Amino acid sequence: MIAFDQLTWLHGKPQSSGLLKANPEDFLVVEDLGFAPDGEGEHVLVRILKNGCNTRFVADALAKFLKIHAREVSFAGQKDKHAVTEQWLCARVPGKEMPDLSKFQLEGCQVLEYARHKRKLRLGALKGNQFTVILREISDRQDVETRLQAIAERGVPNYFGAQRFGIGGSNLQGALRWAESGAPVRDRNKRSFWLSAARSALFNQQVSIRLKKTEFNQVVDGDALQLAGRGSWFVVTPEELEVSQARVHNRELMITATLPGSGDWGSQRDALAFEQAAIAEETALQALLVREKVEAARRAMLLYPQQLSWNWWDDVTVELRFWLPAGSFATSVVRELINTTGDYANIAE
């Protein structure tokens, strides 16, 4: 398995060092659900600004305040404890008067707004996240500036970030031990973290190997191409290569790599052969995903940060602003800019 810090850089390894998250305020995440509350229904959507609190802790506190079971409070995604984050929580409170959530008090948290909603907010049910990231102690401003311009034009690898694999790669190591032992794992959280880490590592490896090719973004026979901004994809035929390549160049289509698991991987012919070869040695992890009936899926190989802008406060400090679709990692953008120091593996996105 390719170590995370050895994954291929799209723009070459950064020349500059820098500090990520010197303070929680240096990493601001604003959740974008992509829809507004209905204004009616048995659920209440609550938008919360938090600093120094993890999502589950706040959700449990909200449940206690509302005198409901913790499972009746849901959210679309985990957000980092060591950052300033805005996100929505959803509480099921049917047949009751609208609770006065302005009275909900928790250190580090502030209720910004709340409204009735018809449906439960489910994990992953968000459009994306808006990020404001401040990088400090940059050693080579010109290198970072050049890279920012390149990222605006060519994007970054859509890697799963280091935080997916746990501190010191603990989640991936757990998956490997599980895969090799075959023993049952009954802890639901461990199962989820370990399976996710296994699939993410296999995806990252495919992308890293493909990026080593000079024509990595050249469509090949059997590639599964994703419609930009959507989850649907189709398999390209030899007759469609030229037209599809033009659409990839225009960012209308995205080349994908497999998230391995049970069932059809989605790609065919030359593309499938490449993916199989890229992770051929990782038989234990592949077998684990099949055994645990994790369904195979696809994910775009490249990521194009939207609304990307930056402002140099001085020669060693830059503020970045960009929007990413759900499931993408801000740290994968930062990785292409600087060799980071600071809190990296603990950032939940």
From Swiss-Prot:
GO terms for biological process: tRNA pseudouridine synthesis. Substrate binds at residues 27, 129, 329. One of its GO terms (molecular function) is tRNA pseudouridine(13) synthase activity. Keywords: Isomerase, tRNA processing. The keyword Transferase does not apply. It catalyses: uridine(13) in tRNA = pseudouridine(13) in tRNA. It comes from the Bacteria. Its EC number is 5.4.99.27. The keyword Isomerase applies. Residues 155-303 form the TRUD domain. CDD domains: PseudoU_synth_EcTruD (cd02575). The active site is at residue 80. GO terms for cellular component: cytosol. InterPro entries: PsdUridine_synth_cat_dom_sf (IPR020103), PsdUridine_synth_TruD (IPR001656), PsdUridine_synth_TruD_CS (IPR020119), PsdUridine_synth_TruD_insert (IPR011760), TruD_catalytic (IPR042214), TruD_insert_sf (IPR043165), TruD_pseudoU_synthase (IPR050170). Responsible for synthesis of pseudouridine from uracil-13 in transfer RNAs. Belongs to the pseudouridine synthase TruD family. NCBIfam families: PRK00984.1-4 (NF002155), tRNA_TruD_broad (TIGR00094). This is tRNA pseudouridine synthase D. It comes from Klebsiella pneumoniae subsp. pneumoniae (strain ATCC 700721 / MGH 78578). The gene is truD.
